[in-house]
């Protein structure tokens, strides 16, 4: 996956998938910071047209545009002003960072981490006009992997139907 926003940052960066450039989208208007490194899985397409979003558990901020190999261990299903917007929860593969290697599914993640992520997702848009987030539910790595597979298929179909392959 590709890092867009480092842990501890309050600037929302987004990679433009067409140009490959990293843009500073906006500063979070609240006093919140990203509780984890945040990015996306390339060559995926959610139903809202965006790549699949991922929060990566870890203690160290990673540089934007970094590529890191991760394993999904859960998913937070949400909806915002633009529609369904899933957030995969992942851990770095063991060779990158063994700190979280014992986590294999959503139920292994400490409640304090889940609560922090949920609070951030639910409130990071609070001071932005006409923006909101609703949390549907947490789910396990099986659904996370299914969502990723569907998004890969959706991306492939999109690319073929738009003559981009």
Describe each model-derived feature in a short phrase.
Residues 1-165:
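Hydrophobic N-terminal alpha-helices or hydrophobic patches in metabolic proteins across all domains
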């Amino acid at each position: 996956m590709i890092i867009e926003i480092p842990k501890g940052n309050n600037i929302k960066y987004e990679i433009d998938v067409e140009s490959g450039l990293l843009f500073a989208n906006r500063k979070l208007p609240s006093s919140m910071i990203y509780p984890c490194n945040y990015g996306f899985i390339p060559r995926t397409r959610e139903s809202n047209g965006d790549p699949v979003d991922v929060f990566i558990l870890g203690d160290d901020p990673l540089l934007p545009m970094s590529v890191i190999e991760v394993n999904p261990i859960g998913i937070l299903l949400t909806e915002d002003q633009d529609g369904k917007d899933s957030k995969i929860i992942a851990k770095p593969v063991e060779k990158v960072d063994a700190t979280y290697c014992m986590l294999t599914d959503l139920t292994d993640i400490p409640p304090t981490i889940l609560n922090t992520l949920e609070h951030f997702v639910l409130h990071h848009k609070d001071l932005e006009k006409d923006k909101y987030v609703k949390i549907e539910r947490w789910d396990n790595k099986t659904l996370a992997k299914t969502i990723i597979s569907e998004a890969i298929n959706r991306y492939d179909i999109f690319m073929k139907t738009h003559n981009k392959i």
